[in-house]
Amino acid sequence: MFELYLIIITCLLLLVCYLITNSLVSIYTQIRVINNIEPIKDKISLGNDYILYMTRLYMKRKKWLYCITMLEFYINQIKIHETEITGEYYNCIGSCYQAIKMYKIAKKYYLKAYKRTPSRQHILKNLANIYNTVGDIKNAKKIYQRLT
């Protein structure tokens, strides 16, 4: 009986250790990304992968305002010819607004993302979903037909 008790306690402690380790790795990665920010001529240079990682992290933690302001800042920093990156950022902003149930604003950002990258499937899917949510079934059907 005592051995069973020790096995159960060990399993629970292993689970707790795993969760703590995952949190520490996430915090370490976030600190490393923040330390890699280099100010260059009043602009902040940060790789697209890091920005999208931070976006996913903020969305996972439901820090919608942080995510939106960070992405808006980097949209203003991007050169005009980088439309794919801008489209991804607009898509993420639309997802944030959709998560806080501001559907009209989310639709606006999904449309901006669609104008920049009309061939991306996940952007089309998000746009169709927001059309459904808003009640614009006609446009939702058009987008769904494009998806298939």
From Swiss-Prot:
Keywords per UniProt: Chloroplast, Plastid, Repeat, TPR repeat
Listed GO CC annotations: chloroplast
Keyword Repeat: yes
Domain of life: Eukaryota
Compartments where located: Plastid, Chloroplast
Keyword Chloroplast in record: yes
Cystine pairs: none
Record-stated family: Belongs to the ycf37 family.
Pfam families assigned to the protein according to its UniProt record, in alphabetical order: TPR_8 (PF13181)
UniProt xrefs under SUPFAM superfamilies: TPR-like
Ranges for the TPR repeats: 87-120, 122-148
Protein name in UniProt: Uncharacterized protein ycf37
